């Protein structure tokens, strides 16, 4: 197999990294932005959720666009948009971009909604590229490599942006976060996609061809599980740094260093989850249990570590437990996306948009709901809720059948 498809997979990983730098930049900058612009935690939670509202609403159109135009053009255009909107965010509070506290909140809500919409193509377009360029037997690991960019971007953001922020302010940190997006946008413009016929050396199975409908019970359960996974994962994307600083009382730089730990671990756990899933599929477990095993294990034990992190009084132990929970939550990404491809067939971009919309509906709720739960019930109980949701997400995989032979009954299920 040519190495060119895997070079494109690495560029997809770099694109995911750049997208997450633009996504989580406000979580870091928020430590100084909130007092500077007079925003409360609840207002900041709404701003975080505005990103996810735009991101979720545009998932399906973005997936359809990727199916029609291809990954290269869609991702190049999207990355240029991330740069432009992030620059406007850095100017928030200057001139006409918000002169009062209420106006400032509205400006940030609008800009975060727009950048969320602009980031919507990232993973549906990446899934469309992987489906076109990589044989099915290797799609678990390919998806794991791509989505490892989530961990890389999230790991880089706190330490790098905190250094920039402490020296030059939160506006400079936001601008710095957009530079990788500019680089990948230019890279996509100069990249040629391989010929599909030369890549698909392993033909899609008849099962995949027959199961292109997004109305199957398996696809609905897959999307529901990914929604619950998104609720848990986005707590760490948006609130972990502020949780460590404000609840566990670490200083800015130490909090930044510790908040990178989950993402450093996930750089390993995400591709590892895909590799393990591919090997289990190729081994005795077959397609059904081979794809189920990693999500069942990962989401269940993520819930266990969330509960341990919530109840410990030791701040350093909490960092370790919650970092392990994050790594396990994200280790399931490869199996989720590979299973979606096995169900969706040629409609991978659209199906990826539907599934990714689900996880971002969960992510839309958690950044806004978590500080409310923390304010009324305490952070411990807010994390207990997340632990229960993670275990529920794992249990849904018992009803997901990537292959017809693994379906719970011989009759097709639709909803």
Regions found by a protein language model. Give the residues of each.
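Cytoplasmic helix-loop-helix junction between adjacent transmembrane helices
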Residues: 111-150
């Amino acid at each position: 197999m040519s190495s060119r498809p895997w070079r494109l997979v690495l560029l997809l990983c770099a694109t995911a990294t750049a997208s997450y730098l633009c996504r989580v930049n406000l979580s870091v900058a928020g430590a100084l932005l909130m007092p500077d612009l007079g925003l409360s935690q609840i207002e900041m939670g709404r701003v975080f959720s505005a990103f996810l509202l735009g991101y979720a609403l545009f998932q399906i159109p973005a997936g359809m666009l990727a199916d029609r135009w291809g990954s290269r053009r869609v991702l190049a255009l999207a990355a240029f948009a991330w740069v432009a909107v992030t620059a406007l965010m850095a100017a928030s509070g200057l001139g006409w971009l918000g002169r009062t506290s209420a106006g400032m909140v509205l400006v940030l809500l609008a800009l975060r909604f727009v950048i969320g919409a602009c980031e919507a193509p990232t993973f549906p377009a990446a899934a469309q590229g992987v489906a076109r360029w990589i044989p099915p037997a290797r799609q678990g690991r390919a998806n794991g490599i791509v989505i490892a960019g989530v961990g890389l971007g999230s790991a880089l953001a706190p330490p790098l942006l905190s250094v920039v922020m402490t020296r030059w302010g939160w506006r400079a940190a936001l601008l710095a976060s957009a530079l990788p997006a500019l680089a990948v946008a230019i890279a996509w413009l100069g990249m040629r996609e391989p010929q599909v016929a030369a890549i698909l050396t392993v033909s899609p199975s008849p099962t995949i061809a027959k199961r292109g409908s997004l109305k199957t019970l398996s696809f609905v359960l897959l999307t529901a599980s990914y929604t619950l996974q998104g609720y848990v994962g986005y707590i760490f994307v948006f609130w972990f740094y502020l949780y460590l600083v404000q609840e566990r009382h670490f200083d800015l730089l130490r909090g930044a260093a510790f908040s990178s730990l989950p993402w450093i671990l996930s750089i390993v756990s995400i591709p590892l989850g895909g590799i393990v899933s591919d090997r289990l599929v190729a081994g005795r477990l077959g397609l059904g249990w081979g794809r189920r095993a990693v999500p069942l294990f990962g989401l269940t034990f993520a819930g266990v570590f969330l509960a341990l992190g919530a109840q410990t009084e030791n701040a350093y132990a909490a960092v370790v437990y919650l970092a392990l929970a994050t790594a396990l939550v994200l280790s399931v990404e490869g199996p989720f996306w590979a299973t979606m491809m096995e169900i969706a067939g040629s409609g991978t971009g659209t199906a990826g948009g539907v599934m990714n919309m689900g996880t971002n509906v969960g992510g839309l709720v958690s950044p806004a709901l978590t500080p409310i739960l923390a304010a009324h019930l305490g952070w411990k109980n807010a994390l207990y809720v997340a632990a229960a949701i993670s275990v529920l997400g794992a249990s849904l995989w018992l009803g997901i059948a990537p292959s017809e032979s693994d379906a719970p009954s011989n009759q097709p299920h639709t909803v």
